[in-house]
């Protein structure tokens, strides 16, 4: 790993209204990662985020809405001098079955507005993305409505396991850098 820290950002929407929704699975993953390292988040005013600093790693939750996530991510990169190649963004993914996780570098945003904002602000799509599968909406439900709904009672039991699996994958990935 080079001298630059790795920035891991969980995407989600701020506020109690969005806690437990599919769109906030990125927050759940980074909260798991920070919690297992006995660390805490604190406000980083210059970037409008909450961050936790671990050895060689900065973990963040933007305090902006999902569609505006790129601005605080860019502010963190500038403040901590982190290149996009050392950024990993954790996000919900409609095109993966519930519970699946997939790590990739670069590539498209799959219509995800948080990733679009991040790519626009970083000036590149060449950063790491950890997609956490939330599945497709049932029937003809609008995907925008689906992602803002809480997980079903049946799914809620699996969310901590999903978050732990995703956090495991992040830790494995960081060891390879």
Curated annotation (Swiss-Prot):
Pfam families for the chain: Pept_tRNA_hydro
Site positions for Discriminates between blocked and unblocked aminoacyl-tRNA: 13
GO MF, one annotated term: tRNA binding
PROSITE patterns according to UniProt: PEPT_TRNA_HYDROL_1 (PS01195), PEPT_TRNA_HYDROL_2 (PS01196)
GO biological process, one term: protein quality control for misfolded or incompletely synthesized proteins
Catalysed transformations (reactions): an N-acyl-L-alpha-aminoacyl-tRNA + H2O = an N-acyl-L-amino acid + a tRNA + H(+)
Family matches, as InterPro entries: Pept_tRNA_hydro, Pept_tRNA_hydro_CS, Pept_tRNA_hydro_sf
Amino acids binding tRNA: 18, 65, 67, 113
UniProt KW keywords: Cytoplasm, Hydrolase, RNA-binding, tRNA-binding
Domain of life, per lineage: Bacteria
UniProt GO cellular component terms: cytoplasm
EC number(s) reported in the record: 3.1.1.29
Annotated site residue numbers, Stabilizes the basic form of H active site to accept a proton: 92
Entry keyword tRNA-binding: yes
Active-site feature positions: 23 (proton acceptor)
Subcellular localization(s) per the UniProt record: Cytoplasm
Subcellular location, principal: cytoplasm
Quaternary structure and interacting proteins, as annotated: Monomer.
Role played: Hydrolyzes ribosome-free peptidyl-tRNAs (with 1 or more amino acids incorporated), which drop off the ribosome during protein synthesis, or as a result of ribosome stalling.
NCBIfam families in UniProt: pth
UniProt family annotation: Belongs to the PTH family.
Protein name per Swiss-Prot or TrEMBL: Peptidyl-tRNA hydrolase
Lineage: Bacteria, Bacillati, Actinomycetota, Actinomycetes, Mycobacteriales
Gene name as annotated: pth
């Amino acid at each position: 790993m080079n001298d630059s820290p790795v920035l891991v950002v969980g995407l989600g929407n701020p506020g109690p209204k969005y806690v437990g929704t599919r769109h906030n699975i990125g927050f759940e993953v980074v909260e798991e990662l920070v919690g297992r390292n006995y660390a805490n988040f604190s406000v980083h005013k210059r970037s409008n985020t909450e961050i936790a600093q671990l050895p060689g790693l900065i973990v963040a939750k933007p305090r902006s809405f999902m569609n505006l996530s790129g601005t605080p991510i860019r502010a963190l990169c500038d403040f901590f001098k982190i290149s996009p190649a050392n950024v990993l963004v954790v996000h919900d993914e409609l095109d993966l079955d519930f519970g699946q996780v997939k790590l990739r570098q670069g590539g498209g945003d799959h219509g995800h507005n948080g990733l679009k904002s991040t790519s626009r602000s970083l000036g590149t799509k060449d950063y790491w993305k950890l997609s956490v599968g939330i599945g497709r909406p049932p029937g003809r439900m609008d995907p925008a409505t689906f992602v803002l709904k809480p997980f079903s009672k049946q799914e809620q039991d699996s969310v901590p396991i999903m978050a732990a699996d995703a956090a495991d994958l992040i830790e494995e990935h960081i060891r390879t850098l």
